[in-house]
């Protein structure tokens, strides 16, 4: 059963995710949480006193990594929206992220491809676990979501047999 909880900040999302993940069999980290937040929270309007403003940023907690680090962790799925800025393949970048965050499965896509991903009804992704990868060619996002749920279900069944 899916559960939606509304939050207002990455920090609140982190707290709620850790609390709720401890009760789950599956945690899908699909929110595009900002990597950084302003160091200082302001409660008043910032005056336009000069032409420039410096804003200090600090790193937000990594929700997927922290869920994966739980003692009794759920099957944890992460997402990686990547841009191809180097010769490194999407699969290699995503696999490194899978290992670093200790995820069970990662779903990655190349957001520099304008015909898929953001601002498109279509997407193409690669699903990667510790032992294999599977490319999901360009289809409507609604169809892709069904394919990914099926893939995740298969992976959970395999993991449960191993236990």
Predicted regions and their residues:
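A cross-family phosphate/adenosyl-ligand binding-site feature
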Residues: 1-163
